[in-house]
């Protein structure tokens, strides 16, 4: 009996201990905790390292935070944020460090690789600063989930990743410069037979697509991978496939199956924009009854919407932009579940009445079509609309009040139409972008726009907006682009417009009626790239605080009344490419320091129509390093780049080829120097000949003297040369005939002498290029150069014809000559008969008489 009690007691104790042990969390092994702490200490915490995080599957934004900050020795690593342990053994089996703000090098011998029992590892959305992906990732033999996406890894994806045969999810997508050799791509698909999700977006694979995909695949993301060849039809018959992304592979040919796909019932998202769609959209598309998202932009589709697409009545996101589709927009009422519709850059026409039927819309982009008429004013059901883009159509009338009343509006773009009327007050408090430029809107800027907390883009240029710029604009502390140019604004520029906004990149207040001084203080650390204030009535000096604009690429203060000397300190803005101070009251000599880096990046320098004096700024001209290179690129023209040129094109007055014009975009190869209409004197520096990339040179209307430098022959891409209205002397260098790109030449009103060079380009210039130079000779002038054939003028030709065609004068001369000859002849005959003169003289006389008679007969025949 005692034995039974003893056994029972021991069993009871064991069960209690077992229950107690199962209820307590296991402490992770000390060596694994140490490995994690060592891993933590390899990186710093930087919020910018995870500044943009989102769920790759749903694209929903995720808030980043430093998970590793909570890691310390005083607690079990199983309780640390992002660390998950096996409930039985306490081993670390999962590590979730996505969006953890980690920054630093990821070393190949990282202590992380000591966690050999890991099954899930997520390091996405950090910044590992161009680290290589270590082959040791292939040693995690138990891994089922591996996510290294968007963490700034670079280089080749190691073949050892192909050893992870248990993987269900593999995400290695990044635009930092990852690549996967074609053989390893094929090996990966062959070995990872358990894959459910494969995401290699933006990895450079440069291969055809093998057909040996895992039959378990639900998600295949291969967008932007440089794939080519023909997509295997087997991909469409993967029975579990839910999401297929192949976008931005222009060398990839996609030929959809003509029969029903095995994935028809499961496929929910299909992204094939910017690929080569072969043939027409087949009827088999009609069976994609579960399809919610279809992206087929830039696929060279043309004509009406393919009929099979009209059967996709469950579609929620539809993108058919950048094609050649046409037809009335009203047909889209059939898609009642649509939340996002993009038909941008097609040929759709008609009105917007269909908006009354699509009440679920959240995002609508119909920009760059042929839509006409006003926007209907009786629409009331679009309370969920967040983004509305109708730019570059033929819409007119006033902007209806329901647009201003949208409670959730975030982005609005109605630019490049002919809308009129006033801009009403906005109800939405969540606006981030308002673009109404290039319309006929009038009135004042509504206060509701100036009180937005998240507004980043405000583009209202090229309208008839009037009034003062309210100081309330300084409340827009998140503003990046402010474009109010080409309106009727007046008054002064609010001092705080730049001072309070640390994010402002583009400031354009050009072509208004603004007055006063530029009294804004440009603070240290600002990120301004464009300042355009030209075409106003601004006075005073160029603010010295502009030297703090270290990122400035364009400064245009032209056509104002600024009264200052040359702001030489602007040369320390090493990003500056375009500097225009034209048509002001700037004066005095242009002085420069010995710093050879000043203005080295300038591509356009326009100081014309001022009062500058003294010699030409030889040292500054010698510093223009960018102009000392010739752009030999071929293909499409490249423009001076700007990260926001999708929204904004600066308007700058360019003087070239003898004309002024407003340039919206400036070619990267456009190198211009315009110092005309000043009081510069002295010689033209020969150092200008080193600026071999120069396209336009205008030094006209100064007091320059001396000779044209022979070094100008080096300006091999020069298209326009204007040296007119100076005191330049000497000859035109014959070497200039080698300038084969020269289209415009003006050397008029100087003191040039000698022969005009001959050549393909010089032979095309008229008198106006040389007038006012009395000492010049040669084509096209009437004065000849030595050794040239006589150039017969039209007047001389007329005179010759007149003399040749006068029968009276010619006939009288012949008669007089014949009469004299007859008298002399008779006398000679008499002497010959009387004196028996030699016979040879008689024969000569007869021959002479025959010649005269023959000429008379010919003259009679002519008339």
From Swiss-Prot:
Changing residue 508 to N: Abolishes resistance to C.fulvum. Changing residue 676 to L: Abolishes resistance to C.fulvum. GO terms for biological process: defense response to fungus; response to molecule of fungal origin. Residues 834-863 are cytoplasmic. Changing residue 85 to A: Severely reduces resistance to C.fulvum. Interacts with thioredoxin-like protein CITRX. The lineage of its organism: Eukaryota, Viridiplantae, Streptophyta, Embryophyta, Tracheophyta. Changing residue 311 to D: Abolishes resistance to C.fulvum. LRR repeats lie at residues 92-115, 116-139, 141-164, 165-191, 192-214, 215-238, 241-263, 265-287, 288-312, 314-335, 336-358, 359-382, 383-406, 408-428, 429-452, 454-476, 477-500, 502-524, 525-549, 551-572, 573-597, 599-623, 667-690, 691-714, 715-739, 741-759. This is Receptor-like protein Cf-9. Residues 24-91 are annotated as: N-cap.
């Amino acid at each position: 009996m005692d034995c039974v009690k003893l056994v029972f007691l021991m069993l009871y104790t064991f069960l209690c201990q077992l229950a107690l042990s199962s209820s307590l969390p296991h402490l992770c092994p000390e060596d694994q905790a140490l490995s994690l702490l060592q891993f933590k200490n390899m990186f710093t915490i930087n919020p910018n390292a995870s500044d943009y995080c989102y769920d790759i599957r749903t694209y929903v934004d995720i808030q980043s935070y430093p998970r590793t900050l909570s890691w310390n020795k005083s607690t079990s690593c199983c309780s640390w944020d992002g660390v998950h342990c096996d409930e039985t053994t306490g081993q670390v089996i999962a590590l979730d460090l996505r969006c953890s703000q980690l920054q630093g090098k990821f070393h190949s011998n990282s202590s992380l690789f000591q966690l050999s029992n890991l099954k899930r590892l997520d390091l996405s959305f950090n910044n590992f600063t161009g680290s290589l992906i270590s082959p040791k990732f292939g040693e995690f033999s138990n891994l089922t989930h591996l996510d290294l996406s968007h963490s700034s890894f670079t280089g080749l994806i190691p073949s050892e990743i192909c050893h992870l045969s248990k993987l269900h999810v593999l995400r290695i997508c990044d635009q930092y410069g990852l690549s996967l050799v074609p053989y390893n791509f094929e090996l990966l698909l062959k070995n990872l037979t358990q894959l459910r999700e494969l995401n290699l977006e933006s990895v450079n694979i440069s291969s055809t697509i093998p057909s040996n995909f895992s039959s378990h695949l639900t998600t295949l993301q291969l967008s932007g991978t440089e794939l080519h060849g023909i997509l295997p039809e087997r991909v469409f018959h993967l029975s579990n496939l839910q999401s297929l992304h192949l976008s931005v592979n222009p060398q990839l040919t996609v030929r959809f199956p003509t029969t029903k796909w095995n994935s028809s019932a499961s496929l929910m998202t299909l992204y094939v924009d910017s690929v080569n769609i072969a043939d027409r959209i087949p009827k088999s598309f009609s069976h994609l009854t579960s399809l919610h998202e279809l992206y087929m932009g830039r696929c060279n589709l043309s004509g009406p919407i393919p009929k099979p697409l009209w059967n996709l009545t469950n579609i929620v996101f539809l993108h058919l932009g950048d094609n050649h589709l046409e037809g009335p927009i009203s047909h889209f009422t059939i898609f009642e579940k649509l939340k996002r519709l993009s038909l941008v850059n097609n040929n759709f026409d008609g009105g917007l009445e269909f908006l009354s039927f699509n009440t679920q819309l959240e995002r609508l982009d119909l920009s760059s079509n042929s839509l006409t008429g006003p926007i209907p004013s009786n629409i009331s059901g679009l309370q969920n609309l967040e983004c509305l883009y109708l730019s570059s159509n033929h819409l007119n009338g006033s902007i209806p009040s329901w647009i201003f009343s949208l409670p959730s509006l975030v982005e609005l773009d109605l630019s490049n139409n002919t809308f009129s009327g006033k801009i009403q007050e906005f109800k939405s408090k969540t606006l981030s972008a308002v673009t109404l430029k290039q319309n006929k809107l009038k009135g004042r800027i509504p206060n509701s726009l100036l009180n937005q907390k998240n507004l980043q883009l405000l583009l209202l240029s090229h309208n008839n907006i009037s009034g003062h710029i309210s100081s309330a604009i300084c409340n827009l502390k998140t503003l990046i682009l402010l474009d109010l140019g080409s309106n009727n604004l007046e008054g002064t520029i609010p001092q705080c417009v730049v001072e309070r906004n640390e994010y402002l990149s583009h400031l354009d207040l050009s072509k208004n009626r603004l007055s006063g001084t530029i009294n804004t203080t440009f603070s240290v650390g600002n990120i301004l790239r464009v300042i355009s204030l030209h075409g106003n009535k601004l006075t005073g000096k160029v603010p010295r605080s502009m030297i703090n604009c270290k990122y400035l690429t364009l400064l245009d203060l032209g056509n104002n009344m600024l009264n200052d000397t040359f702001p030489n300190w602007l040369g320390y803005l090493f990003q500056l490419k375009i500097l225009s101070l034209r048509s002001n009251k700037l004066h005095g000599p242009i002085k420069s320091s010995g710093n050879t880096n000043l203005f080295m990046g300038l591509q356009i320098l326009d100081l014309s129509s001022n009062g500058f004096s003294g010699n030409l700024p030889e040292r500054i001209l010698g510093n223009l390093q960018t102009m000392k290179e010739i752009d030999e690129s071929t293909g499409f023209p490249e423009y001076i780049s700007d990260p926001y040129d999708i929204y904004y094109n600066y308007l700058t007055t360019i003087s070239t080829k003898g004309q002024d014009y407003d340039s919206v975009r400036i070619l990267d190869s456009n190198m211009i120097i315009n110092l005309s209409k000043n009081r510069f004197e002295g010689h033209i520096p020969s150092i200008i000949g080193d600026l071999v990339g120069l396209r336009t040179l205008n030094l006209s209307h100064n007091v320059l003297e001396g000779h044209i430098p022979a070094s100008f022959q080096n300006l091999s891409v020069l298209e326009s040369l204007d040296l007119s209205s100076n005191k330049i002397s000497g000859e035109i260098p014959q070497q200039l005939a080698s300038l084969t790109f020269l289209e415009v030449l003006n050397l008029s009103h100087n003191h040039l002498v000698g022969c005009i060079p001959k050549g393909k380009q010089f032979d095309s210039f008229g008198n106006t290029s040389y007038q006012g130079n009395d000492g010049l000779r040669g084509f096209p002038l009437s004065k000849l150069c030595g050794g040239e054939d006589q150039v017969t003028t039209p007047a001389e030709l007329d005179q010759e014809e007149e003399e040749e065609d006068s029968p009276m004068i010619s006939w009288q001369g012949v008669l007089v000559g014949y009469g004299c000859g007859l008298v002399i002849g008779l006398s000679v005959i008499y002497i010959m008969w009387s004196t028996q003169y030699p016979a040879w003289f008689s024969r000569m006389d007869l021959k002479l008489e025959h010649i005269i008679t023959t000429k008379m007969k010919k003259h009679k025949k002519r008339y």
